[in-house]
Swiss-Prot record:
Heptamer of 7 subunits arranged in a ring. Interacts with the chaperonin GroEL. One of its GO terms (molecular function) is unfolded protein binding. NCBIfam families: PRK00364.1-2, PRK00364.1-5, PRK00364.2-2, PRK00364.2-4, PRK00364.2-5. CDD domains: cpn10 (cd00320). Belongs to the GroES chaperonin family. SMART domains: Cpn10. The keyword Cell division does not apply. Together with the chaperonin GroEL, plays an essential role in assisting protein folding. The GroEL-GroES system forms a nano-cage that allows encapsulation of the non-native substrate proteins and provides a physical environment optimized to promote and accelerate protein folding. GroES binds to the apical surface of the GroEL ring, thereby capping the opening of the GroEL channel. The lineage of its organism: Bacteria, Pseudomonadati, Thermodesulfobacteriota, Desulfobacteria, Desulfobacterales. This is Co-chaperonin GroES.
Length: 95
């Protein structure tokens, strides 16, 4: 199954955080914070402005982004967890 986001939405795969600290301590899943970094895996075409013209997306597939920890809607596709969010929910692109 594949998912194509509509309008100004993007499909994001979270970047997994490390399982161990620098000192070698293993961090259990319950103690991990939700990562606020992810990779854009699909993108909509943009949104329609008040003048009726299409405003294209600034983000593209492959961009690594920073977003609010609790932003987006969680979805599971073929056993993989993703987030769907609006482009406006993205804080920045990591270059």
């Amino acid at each position: 199954m594949s998912l194509r986001p509509l309008q100004d939405r993007i499909l994001v795969e979270r970047v997994q955080e490390t399982e161990k600290t620098k000192g070698g301590i293993i961090i259990p899943d319950t103690a991990k914070e939700k990562p606020a970094e992810g990779k854009v895996v699909a993108s909509g075409n943009g949104r329609v402005g008040e003048d009726g013209k299409l405003i294209p997306m600034d983000l593209k597939v492959g961009d690594t982004i920073l977003f609010s920890k609790y932003g987006g809607t969680e979805v599971k596709i073929d056993g993989t967890d993703y987030l769907i969010m609006r482009q406006d929910d993205v804080l920045g692109v990591i270059e």
